[in-house]
Amino acid sequence: MGRLALISVTDKTGIVDFARQLTEEFDFEIISSGGTAKTLQSAGIPVIKVGEYTGSPEILGGRVKTLHPRIHGGILARRDWQSDLAEMEANQIRPFDLVVVNLYPFEQTIANPDVTTAQAIEQIDIGGPAMLRASAKNFAHLTVISNPKYYEQYLSQLRQNNGEISLEFRQKMAGETFALTNAYDGAIAAYFASLNGETTRFNLAGNALQTLRYGENPHQSATWYGSGTMAQGWGKATLLQGKELSYNNLVDLEAARRLIAEFGSEEPAAAILKHTNPCGVAIGGSLVEAYTKAFNADAISAFGGIVALNQAIDEATAKELTKTFLECVVAPDCSPEAQDILAKKSKVRILLLPDLTTGEKQTVKVIAGGFLVQAADDVVETPDEWRVVTEKQPTPAQLAELLFAWKVSKHVKSNAIVVTKNQTTLGVGAGQMNRVGSVKIALEQAAEAAKGGYLASDGFFPFDDSVRTAAQFGIEAIVQPGGSLKDQDSINAANELGLIMVLTGIRHFLH
């Protein structure tokens, strides 16, 4: 008898050509089930159906097809154990040389926001993972392939090794398979956690998208993984031009995406970041105005920065973008005319990400011996929910300015202070160990332009020194979360100095 392959795939990419080469070039017999058998038979490839081989028909609407001793015995049998071989002979079980299986599209199914629980459950594969895990466990005696990208490598192994498959390759395929089943079960567990609330286990899995040149620094290795279906996110971004993305590029781009997402897409907005902190953010009457305002907010820091735009890049904006060196520019789209202009700066990475507003619902940080998971800080706030605590009341226009400053402060490393005017950042104080230190940095950067401006603080003021410093620079209104035992001291200082103060009740620390 020739070699025996078991093929049962949902993703039929390349399966016909692969099966044809197995049968015609290497004398494989193929056992297959359901839609895979029909696909191969319609292509003229001889197939033994699972039901014919096992003597048991598919039952329960196809829920039970391959869960049979003649299938799993042929997968799990140890070819160097006489007792296993004797049992196989007694039960007319043939050993498989190759198992090719991929799984029902569970993650793609639950990516649909309208999917019902019943629909999701029907896409939980049972037989597929069972065959994959059994095959991977027994890699010493057979090969398992769970991804079409390995079909050609398997054929090359046969050709180069006189029809044999190396143990190294079989072990590699086993590892890939266990990683797949782990991720698949993790997605199912995460789905049920979303239905039931918090769970005692958290699974984090992904597919390697790219081996990066290095991490934050040249001596650190790094890999980019994609999670879930990647229906959104950077794995779906189009790189129009420029070199491949680096680790630092991706970290900065995600920070820029989160910030620009605050402003939706109706009003043109631009953000420029360095080392994940904004150095210039603005809203304008046009995209080019928004970008120009953001750039001029801190032209020195903008050099080599990451730019995020919430509308398609037009010709006028493209011309401004080419006037300085930038690492990356991301926008939802780019006109052909703008592309031609940007091409003159071929080293600038231009990315298109149509949906800049959709991000992960959780954030993860690795610590020694584990990791921390928290809900993303994606709360949507409006001034209607805020509390004015000073005698002086803000106008609607002033509240709009405070909201702009508040949105930006959320994306600055704590302790964070943002000074703005005309919906443009004037000064950003980031990452200082005391809040008044960040206040001074932001105000000194804004300098005389701070007069009549607005100040946002991501955390409360422990003392009134920040308020008094702001008043010295002519700040008109302050927005902060409140919550200090000495809130009243800051409120009293604001009243004494004629400032407006608004408390949001929500803190936005960023570490």
From Swiss-Prot:
One of its GO terms (biological process) is 'de novo' IMP biosynthetic process. Pfam families: AICARFT_IMPCHas, MGS. CDD domains: IMPCH (cd01421). It comes from the Bacteria. InterPro entries: AICAR_Tfase_dup_dom_sf (IPR024051), Cytidine_deaminase-like (IPR016193), MGS-like_dom (IPR011607), MGS-like_dom_sf (IPR036914), PurH-like (IPR002695). SMART domains: AICARFT_IMPCHas, MGS. One of its GO terms (cellular component) is cytosol. Coiled coil: none annotated. The keyword Transferase applies. Signal peptide: none annotated. Its EC number is 2.1.2.3, 3.5.4.10. GO terms for molecular function: IMP cyclohydrolase activity; phosphoribosylaminoimidazolecarboxamide formyltransferase activity. Residues 1-146 form the MGS-like domain. The IMP cyclohydrolase activity resides in the N-terminal region. Belongs to the PurH family. This is Bifunctional purine biosynthesis protein PurH. It comes from Microcystis aeruginosa (strain NIES-843 / IAM M-2473).
